[in-house]
Amino acid sequence: MITRRTLMGSLVPALAAARLAGKGRHVVFVVGDQEYRSEESMPAFAKMLEAHHGFRCTLVLPRNPQTGEVDPGVSDNLVGLEALDKADLMVMFLRFQELPDAQMKHIIDYAEAGRPIVALRTSTHAFNYQKNLASPYARYSFRSREFEGGFGRQVLGETWINHYGVHQQESTRGVPAPGMERHPILRGVKDVWGPSDVYAITTLTGDSKPILLGQVLAGMEPTSPPNPAKKLVPVAWIKSYKGARVFTTTMGHPGDFANDGFRRMMVNACYWALGMESKIPRRAKVDFTVPYNPSPIGFRKRK
């Protein structure tokens, strides 16, 4: 028998879900980086966005064309990119992809239509054309001269330069950029730290504005001292592209996602990119909804 108590009990989760700000918004994660275990961190992050914030998330992962299995060593096959055609937001974590034109078209059409993007770490060098140089999309390659600096520099704000912090020896402490302490993306964000090393950034393009600066630490612990020989450089910034909001961070090591402050910044960035900054909670909920024990970083060859 359905009682008032059981009816109210069944309504509580439904009402809570209805109140989640992201309800009705579709986020597509485009993933494939070979080194930083994005195939593990992005699914966990997507589940968190769905459970705590109501966004509907779709994952597009690199798949072995023979087996159909997720394979981070694959850099030429992202099945399911047509989901971008009706997406509200693209979250990308890519590195050195050279996709078939039919797949690449969905990514470029999305960006060139002026639609919001959130990008992580190696996405500054998302594409690397070495085989199909006649492709109309080869101009988006990270060392492109025709479209100077390719997708990374033109769309996101910078391409790959080099490591600034020593890789796997110097970690990163996040410091709000001057004047950005009250920016919505940093709402409730404290104590950002991660084992990712700071990338070298020369000049951010267009209307880019740093949000978070990276302090190079002389060690791999949150308590490691700063390296006094290395200045602070941007590790997260905002800009526009074709009228759309773009957020980019060069953080994204799987260990970075163990940090509440970093996860909260990423959640807030999704809200901001969608023009929903008024909906960003004072302290966004960022608890993982699945166990998060990422594998060590390192390159994985195609299976």
For the regions a language model picked out, list residue spans one by one:
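Short, well-ordered beta-to-alpha junction loops that form the rim of enzyme active sites
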Residues: 122-123, 214-215, 250-252
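C-terminal segment of N-terminal export signals and the immediately downstream linker at the start
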Residues: 1, 18-28
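N-terminal secretory signal peptides and thylakoid transit peptides that target proteins
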Residues: 1-13
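Helical hinge/lid and interdomain linker segments adjacent to catalytic or ligand-binding clefts
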Residues: 28-29, 34-126
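Extracellular ligand-binding/catalytic regions of CAZymes and related secreted enzymes
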Residues: 24-25, 40-41, 51-52, 218-303
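Catalytic beta-strand/loop cores that center a nucleophilic Ser/Cys/Thr
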Residues: 50, 56, 74-75, 86, ...
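A glycine-rich, often tryptophan-bearing local segment used as a flexible ligand/cofactor-contacting loop or short
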Residues: 92, 97-187
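Non-transmembrane alpha-helical segments in soluble domains
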Residues: 8, 46, 108, 186, ...
